[in-house]
Amino acid sequence: MGIYPDEVTTFAAVVLYGAPVAVAVLSYLLGCINGAIATSHLCYHDDVRRHGSGNAGLTNFYRNYGARCAPMVIAFDMLKAVGAVLLGNYFLGYLLGWGVAGKYFAALFCVIGHMFPIFYGFKGGKGILCSGTLLLLLDWRIALVGWGVFAALWLTTRYVSLGSVAAAASFPFMTYFIFRDAVTTALGTCIALLVLWAHRSNIKRLLSGTESKFHFHVNAPKPGEDQ
């Protein structure tokens, strides 16, 4: 039995419209796997969001539990970013010809999942570790600038939030400079705005001079104990 033209057209339409939806949903679900929350449950039978700043991110995890299980947080958040970008790159970038915009599309929904995870009552992290990993996967030049800005400001001021905000702000400009593509730049701008919105309370504290600085410590406090 042969394949009729209308069947081919229907299949093409399903792929054309179904692939972006599937990538968006899967990337979002991958983003929902929060490394800080999962690791605090696995290692300490606790929820990192109950302590410190209440944020489900690496900084708050480290401040409350120390360095022993921090690599697990990093692994969780890096692997989900890799998975999302691979999905976007293959199904959108390669099969549908979106190019690098396919990776940016998946990255956006991964960040949304990280910040608003359906598994954890839509209360997630601020997206820095996840976004930082995505930078490495999207383009090494953008990653070099973003990570460079973050490291320079963090090391000189000890404000993780300041480095994060500045790196996020540079992202859409670097995206446009490298790719000169309106769609890709728009997606990059959406990611940056999400990260900046997530850091709105940090920005207020930076402006008022009440933001906490980040310092390394060797000994962790008791599991679940606020600092």
Predicted regions and their residues:
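Helix-coil boundary and interhelical linker segments in multi-pass alpha-helical membrane proteins
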Residues: 1-22, 85-105, 136-142, 176-187
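Multi-pass membrane catalytic core of lipid/isoprenoid biosynthesis enzymes
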Residues: 63-89
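Hydrophobic alpha-helical transmembrane segments
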Residues: 17, 21-25, 71, 103-108, ...
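Cytosolic, membrane-interface loops and tails of multi-pass inner-membrane proteins
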Residues: 37-70, 204-227
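Interfacial segments of multi-pass membrane proteins
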Residues: 60-66, 88-92, 109, 113, ...
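C-terminal ends of transmembrane helices
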Residues: 36-40, 59-60, 113-123, 150-157, ...
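N-terminal signal-anchor transmembrane alpha helix
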Residues: 18-43
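Short, non-helical or kinked segments that cap or interrupt transmembrane helices
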Residues: 46-58, 119-132, 159-167
